[in-house]
Amino acid sequence: MVIRLGRRTLEDIHAHAESAYPEECCGLLIAGSGSKDVVDSIKMRNAFSGPRHDRYHIDPLELFRADREAASRGLTIAGVYHSHPDYPATFSKFDIEHSFPLYSYLVVSVSKGEAGDTRSWLPNQDHNSVAEEEIEILDVRREEDGVTKRA
C-alpha cells in the first residue's frame, strides 16, 4: 500500500511534532472518502493521563467530532499520526496493541526537538504485527473546500 501526503500537510505534521517536543504529539490524517490521498491533518490534544514523552491518547469524543467535521467536507479519517521524541519512527508494541487495523499510522521521529525520519505503518487485524507502508509526497496546494490540486 501507498499513502500519499501533500508536502504542506507533512510540514504541518512535522511542525506539530516539534512544538510538542519532548512530549508525543498526535493528530489525524484526513483523506478523500475511501482514499489514501491525505489532503489535510487535524491536530489532536494528547489526552494521555500519565507521562506523555512516550505515550499518546486521543479522546474518543474529540475523535468523533473530528470524524463528523471531515464527513461534512466529504472527507474521512484515513489514519493517525504521532511523534516519537528521541526515538526511531518505528511502531512500538504499545502502538500495535492500541491501533485500529483500518488506519494508517504515520510516526515522526523527533530528535532534540527536530522532526526527522517519518514512516507509515499498517497494523494487522490481530494486533500482533505491522507492515510498513510507502509514503509518497505530493507537491500540492490546498483549496478552501478541502480538495487538493497538484501544483
Regions found by a protein language model. Give the residues of each.
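Conserved, mostly hydrophobic/aromatic
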Residues: 80
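Conserved beta-strand-loop surface patch within small alpha/beta domains used
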Residues: 1-77, 86-151
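Short, well-ordered beta-to-alpha junction loops that form the rim of enzyme active sites
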Residues: 83
